[in-house]
Amino acid sequence: MASRSLTDLNEILVDAYNKACAEYLSLYPDKSQPFITCTYRSNDEQNALYAYGRTRMGNKVTNAQAGQSPHNYKPSAAFDIAFIGLGKKLDWSKNNFRLFADIIAKIQPLVVCGIDFKSLPDAPHFELKDWRKYVK
């Protein structure tokens, strides 16, 4: 199972995520709040996701095969989030992701959000710009 642990995440991302969460809560205390759904992901998990829309039923969810995703390294150069609201209900409103992306971009310009990806937009995804420079 993919990790949700901040200890598996690049320190730049940990700092940016924590600061962005605090600011988001301060600005939007009554809105659904972000939480981490994935930091590190194994190559097997990556290949399973890559199969969607190709050899497995469903829509494509990634363009990255194993080793091509910033999630596939430790520390991870990416994280995914979701939002949880009242009653522990998941909230996938694109507006929440946009608000969080704008906050994190101001806090740490090295972090980019997949909401603006051209080939396969991925609003829950945040990664280090030029992430390959940060992985081994």
Language-model features, listed with the residues they occupy:
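Acidic helix-start/capping segments at beta-turn-to-alpha-helix junctions
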Residues: 36-49
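Cytochrome P450 catalytic domain signature, combining two hallmark sequence patches
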Residues: 53-68
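Generic secondary-structure microfeatures
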Residues: 38-40, 53, 83-85
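Structured segments of extracytoplasmic/periplasmic soluble domains
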Residues: 19-27, 46-53, 103-110
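Short, surface-exposed, charged loop/turn segments at secondary-structure junctions
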Residues: 50-55, 130-132
